[in-house]
Amino acid sequence: MSNAKHYDGLDREEIDSRRREYGTNVLTPAAKESLLKRFLGKFKDPLIVVLCVAGAASLGISFYEYFGLHLGGTVFFEPVGILMAILLATGIGFWLEVKADREFAILNQVNDDQPVQVIRSGQVAQVPRRDVVVGDIVFINTGDEIPADGLLLEGVSINVDESSLTGEPICHKTTDPALFDSDATYPSNRLMRGTKVMEGHGVMEITAVGDRTENGKVFTAAQIDNSVKTPLDRQLVGLGKMISRASYCIAALIVIGRIAMFLTSVEFDWITFTTFFLQTIMIAVTLIVVAVPEGLPMAVTLSLAFSMRRMLKTNNLVRKMHACETMGATTVICTDKTGTLTQNRMQVYKTDFFGNIPDNVIYEGIALNSTAQLDKIEDKLTVLGNPTEGALLLWLLERGVDYSALREKCKVAEEIPFSTERKYMASVVECDGRKTLYVKGAPEIVYGMCQDKSGTTKEQVDLLLANYQNQAMRTLGFAYKEIEDSSQVIVDNTISIGGLVFLGIAAISDPVRADVPAAVEEVRNAGITVKIVTGDTPGTAKEIGRQINLWNDATDSQDNIITGTEFEALNDKDLLQRVRDIKIIARARPMDKKRLVEALQTLGEVVAVTGDGTNDAPALKAAQVGLSMGDGTSVAKEASDITIIDNSFASIGRAVMWGRSLYRNIQRFILFQTTVNIVACLIVLCGAFMGLQSPLTVTQMLWVNLIMDTFAAMALASLPPSEKVMNDKPRSQSDFIINSSMWKFILGTGLLFFAVLIVLLYYFEHTDLTSLQQIGSLTVGEFKGLSPYELSLFFTIFVFLQFWNMFNARAFATGKSAFHFKGCSGFVCIALVIALGQILIVNCGGEFFNVVPIRLDDWIIIILSTSIVVWIGELLRLIAKS
């Protein structure tokens, strides 16, 4: 509000007193389910129910064997193993969910830190929304979210969207009791927390904060919606179903095969058969637990959460989880100019005022026909509000004019707020007994409203504008009129009188960000099309395009640039024919951006769009990824998926790189997990037919599951992003997550591992091997089963084959060596945990893991011989690279 400075606001003592009495402006989150209740919820899983039933039966048999047959305490190892299976299957998923919740918790508190303009101790200041207290005097402008409940003190054309509270999209707010709407849910001078200013500006006094607001009374913890089903989600569901069906079939074959083997090779005894049948069911169920990728969704969530946290360090605040991976599939970026491509550091480059107009008229017009403020923080002036208007206030200060003194001295009687449709704003000012109308806006609009052209011609003004615009400068036109009588000047947000006098033009520069040309080139090399959508003139927009190497005068033509008016005139058919060729839309309006997004989507493009204003919300919601700016309005941020904190286009390029790298990391995890699935399922299936004893016990398979689901997810999710992904073209949405090269790797590696392990299994079952050095020297004889030492060898060889294969999975599609560890400290640490864990299990696990300690020379043989897996991978990568 131009003359709102006469409010003193609260002082420091009053602020502290109000905060103690009325509390802070933060909503208390709704109570969540307790951790215990969430953990118990995991036991509703059908697989866990089967494990619980099997565990109870196993415990009953163990009690019978211990008390009835006096077989000793070792009989309880099986039920303890089942208990471990249950705790692992439930505990890991529970832990990952809690971890993911903590990763996302910060995102749901971001709004409490949104800046709010207040008057305190007679000075305009900016404070976080959480610090607003009862009694604060708050400025509100178009696009703002009301920070707390309060009363409107002054307002100009204020319309508020109360749909989040009452369902009413537009409610007019006023301080005039004669204009109050008797049918409104809340009085017309009351403003409610969480509602949004769609038009106008004003001043309000806070009357309630936090839980005492109307919004707080009906508040339920509003979490970010991460339920959007993306192509990746659908592919993962399909992959999970495919693996699940295969594992169920293999489990059924194991049960049938082992029962058939028992009935044909052992004299039937009910107690023995019951024990054997229970063991068979346990093997089948455990195989399902291992094979079914119940950890896959959580592993993806962990990867997303990990990426979200690290993307924040590159100025990308991800609000909606799916946007992480969708950015990697983006094919078109529709970007604003101001603040995104440019520095948004507006400064008046030059002014051209015509005629013999007194300076005080120009100064009054700039100071009073404005909603911007200047805030002095540590001797540095900061613009609060529109940066273009702020540049004009700074220009006044350079000339020794105190804009705040003018606002104290004069009164704004009527106003028309700026809108993208009108492209101008106007104020009727009463000062020193004079009444003056001031108009400011797009020069061509303002000039057309003037009767007195101050000795200029349209051609002269157009030439002047073209000169500035060709230097990528923003231009504003100014006009005024002295009002002689008391007639109403503004009617229905329209100037009702004529005879305006043209004052002149101000050219305002906003340099291109230094890192933007390289960032634009990077995303274009990545196969992504960049389009500029701006409210500036064609000349200004084209010059910015030249500076960032998007526009080339030698190759581009009028087919590649269009104005908002021309864009609107295109029918849908013509638009679809032209839309891919359009590089720049100048003088664009908000709905032009939304229509552009929808047209591109119709052609199968994946669109990311930037926006910072309230009117950008439709386009931000329509795009696959909406990118709001850090200093954008609350409405824009709420409609977006990612907030670019520093407003820079370079950060958008970083988001694309993260999205593509994230997708690759998920592919690597699936590559590793699916290979282990194939090997484990085939080994257990064949083992059931080759002998009565399963080569992998319940507890051993659960360790494999821990490696496969949790450790591998953590290791591969922690891999840093790769710059090389920006050399690839965007992936097609229809591409299955397991591509042909992955299938070759999975099937080739899986079948090779199976062949090696099944030969070893057969050899172990038909010899009395006591050291791996005996391989080749012992004669294969009759079936003898597996000794504890042979079981330990087989289990360790199986694990270390997967261990080395994890290095191959990590190096997949990177073009780098599996031993390139720069930036991969997390991967190295987890690999060491797996290796040390296996050594401890074999040496200390005893009967619980059904293992015995392995000789040192056998450890060396296993580690060296299984490492051939990674050396073969290195050789294949070297061949592919050359």
Residue ranges and their predicted role:
Residues 732-752, 781-793, 821:
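Membrane-water interface at loop-to-transmembrane-helix junctions
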Residues 676-680, 745-757, 833:
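Core segments of transmembrane alpha-helices
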Residues 688-697, 763-789:
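Helix-coil boundary and interhelical linker segments in multi-pass alpha-helical membrane proteins
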Residues 708, 753, 789-806, 831:
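Generic alpha-helical transmembrane segments
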Residues 1-730, 735-738, 795, 812-882:
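Conserved cytosolic headpiece of P-type ATPases
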